[in-house]
Amino acid sequence: FTHIYDELVMQEELICGLAAPIITGNSCLGVLVVGHRKRTALTQANLDTLTLIANLLAVEITRDRAEESLQKSLEHLRTVFECTVNALSITAEKKDPYTAGHQRRVASLACAIAQEMKLPQYYIDNVRTASVLHDIGKLQIPTDILTKPGGLTEIERLLVKTHTQAGYEIVKTIPFAQAISTALLQHHERMDGSGYPQGLSGEEILLEARILAVADVVEAMASHRPYRPALGIESALEEIRQGAGIIYDAEVVEACLKVFSSKNFTF
């Protein structure tokens, strides 16, 4: 720095100058220097102004560095979160081999619906994560019930229904995942209040859960299950078409139908 300063002084024929360090914490990041060709041209007021500018620069640099550090921390947390989500999803699918891939197919459709609805990116991210995890609560359900080829008894049906609450209890412990855990809890709620576990209706149901409900039904009906063969996409779409505004959110259904008819969506 000194040789640059010396060259500048000689080149510009400066005979007086002021300097104010840019300090953050215990570090000096640089120095603001002002020079003049007249010996008496610079005053204490000039030095005060230069010092103020140096301090403002220090604040801005500190803030930028803090924001950069925070961004890196958030990216790390996001990576850890995504790895956790993937691990939980794989664990759930191993529990029920008949629905292997179900959660990811639901996520694919649910995200396409959210995008068709022109929702902000954070909604789409929540929908994706909730979809990938929506059956995580089935980890507590015995495998022989999940894979039972015939109809379930009333007690078995009630036991299967507990997976929404169980999934909520698992995911609610993850930081920043309140909307996701709530979507897991509510994805079997229905617009007319006929769903479970709380019998919510209309906009009492989180939007992410309303989207997940439609995507889940379509994928489930279109795919093979231990107790029935696949019913096909057309039957699944007719189901949500007839239930639009009654048991399924009408706007979500409209977006889902458009995804298949206009966007040629496939699982």
Tell me the role of every PLM-derived stretch.
Residues 1-16, 36, 190-201:
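Signal-transducing coupling segments at domain and membrane junctions
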Residues 15-23:
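A short, aliphatic-rich beta-strand micro-motif
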Residues 22-25, 39:
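Sensor-regulatory modules in signal-transduction proteins
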Residues 28:
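Glycine-rich acetyl-CoA-binding "A-motif" of GNAT/NAT acetyltransferases
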Residues 31-41, 149:
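Short beta-strand-to-loop transition segments that serve as allosteric relay/switch motifs
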Residues 44, 73-76, 82-267:
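Metal-dependent catalytic cores of enzymes that make or break cyclic nucleotides
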Residues 51-58:
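Allosteric cytosolic regulatory segments
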Residues 57, 63-66, 70, 77, ...:
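Heptad-repeat alpha-helical coiled-coil signal-transmission segments
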